[in-house]
Amino acid sequence: MLKNKKSDNSLSRDTLQIKKRKKTTMAQNGSNTTVKLIGTWASPFAIRAQVALHLKSVEHEYVEETDVLKGKSDLLIKSNPIHKKVPVLIHGDVSICESLNIVQYVDESWPSDLSILPTLPSERAFARFWAHFVDGKLFESIDAVAGAKDDAARMTLAGNLMENLAALEEAFQKSSKGGDFFGGGNIGFVDITVGAIVGPISVIEAFSGVKFLRPDTTPGLIQWAEKFRAHEAVKPYMPTVAEFIEFAKKKFSV
C-alpha cells in the first residue's frame, strides 16, 4: 500500500510548510553535563524520548535530523554506529540508543517525585510486558497492513491488527482503574510506549479507509489517545494527524 520513496530531500518540517514548534526550555537538574537529543519531528520513537525528558524537566538541546532518508548526519552516525537511527540521547560522552532504553535511562538518571516506571516490581513487569507487545506484535501488525499488496491481504492483516488493539484495550481497562492513562492519573512508561502508535494508526486509517480505533471495540483507547495528545508533556512534540499524513505522502510517494 505504501511504497517507500528512497530519495526525497523535501521531508523537513519547514519544506512541508508546517509550523515548527519551539524548543521547550526546562529546568536544569543540577548537573552541568551536556544533554542532547537527536531526533526527527515525525518519528514516534523520538517523541517518546522528548516526552520523558519533559516529564523529568531535563534541560537539553534538541538536534533535528532533517533528511534521514537521503542521508544521516555525522553526529548521528557517530552516536549510533550500529543502527544509525534516531532517537539518540547524548549525556556527556555517553550515547544512549533505542527509544525505550532512553526513557528508562532518563527515569533513572534524573530521579524525581514523578517516576516514569512504576516502583512496584509487579507493576514494572506489567509495563515492560506491554512495551514488548507494542514494539513487537503491535508494530508488526501495523507495518503488515501498511505494506499489504492488495485489498484482500489488507483486510486479513487488518483483522490481526484489530485483535492486537483489542488486547491492548483490555490491558488499558484493567490497568487504568478508571483513570485517564494506563497507570491511572498520569502518564507513565506504558503510555509513552503506546503513544508511538498514535501517528502510524492515523496514517493507515487515512490510506486504507479502515477505522482501527472504534467506539465499539476500543472505547478506552480512543479516550486515552485524546488525553495523551493533550497532555502538557506530549502536546509540544506530537504532530497533528494532518501533519503525520502529509509526511507519509511525501515519504511514500502517495
Swiss-Prot record:
Q: What are its GO biological-process terms?
A: glutathione metabolic process; toxin catabolic process
Cite the entry's keywords alphabetically. Detoxification, Nucleus, Stress response, Transferase
The molecular function GO annotations come to: glutathione transferase activity
| EC numbers on record | 2.5.1.18
Which SUPFAM superfamilies is this protein grouped with? GST C-terminal domain-like, Thioredoxin-like
Q: Which residue numbers delimit the GST C-terminal domain?
A: 120-252
* Predominant subcellular localization, coarse grouping: nucleus
Subcellular localization is given as: Nucleus
Tell me which InterPro entries the record gives. Answer: Glutathione-S-Trfase_C-like, Glutathione-S-Trfase_C_sf, Glutathione_S-Trfase, Glutathione_S-Trfase_N, GST_C_Tau, Omega/Tau-like, Thioredoxin-like_sf
- Pfam families xrefs: GST_N
Superkingdom as given in the UniProt entry: Eukaryota
* Annotated binding of glutathione, by residue: 43-44, 71-72, 85-86, 98-99
- What Gene Ontology cellular-component terms does the record carry? cytoplasm; nucleus
Domain GST N-terminal residues, every copy? 33-114
* Motif Nuclear localization signal per record, residues: 19-23
Main EC class the enzyme belongs to: transferase
Q: Tell what triggers its expression.
A: By fungal elicitor.
Q: Which reaction does it catalyse?
A: RX + glutathione = an S-substituted glutathione + a halide anion + H(+)
Please give the family membership noted in the entry. Answer: Belongs to the GST superfamily. Tau family.
Q: What is its biological role?
A: May be involved in the conjugation of reduced glutathione to a wide number of exogenous and endogenous hydrophobic electrophiles and have a detoxification role against certain herbicides.
Name of the molecule in the record: Glutathione S-transferase U12
The protein's organism comes out as Arabidopsis thaliana
Query: What's the source species' lineage?
Result: Eukaryota, Viridiplantae, Streptophyta, Embryophyta, Tracheophyta
